[in-house]
Amino acid sequence: MDRTIRKESAVAQGETKLLYPGLAGFYETMLPIAATFVRVVVGIMFLMHVTTKFKLGADAVAANIFAKNGIEPALMWAYVIMFLEAVGGVCLIIGLFTRFFAAALAIEMLVALLFVHLPKGYAAAGGGYEYVLLIGMVCFAIAIRGGGPYSVDRAIGKEL
């Protein structure tokens, strides 16, 4: 896929032309760096999020989140989600199995949106789906883009 930012006057159909062509080099340099920052920050966010679940314990997570929202078997799902958020968060940070874990986390966010947050409305302050939708879409974008040049996936030369 060509990620070159066009700076010439003849722009192909469907492409945009930079208002200030002098920025093309900056954008081309920053694209992989910015994508890496996004991947790492999302991984850190999942680690921070799962820390609360570990402090509560799987039984409390199962009772307060899964069983309360009709997701059964609640204890099994508590363990699965805690594993996914912990291991997936670390893998996003280092860029290992990036596409797999980003897709799995995007699916988790979709399920959380539909079963837990949607009935509460949009606003995150009221437990709504605002935050979950955003993180889910960012995970989807990471799954499509992959780990990028600054990832273990790239270092080993293989990814899903």
Locations of regions flagged by a protein language model:
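Extended, low-polarity transmembrane helix blocks
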Residues: 1-53, 75-83, 87, 93-160
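Membrane-interface interhelical connector segments
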Residues: 54-76
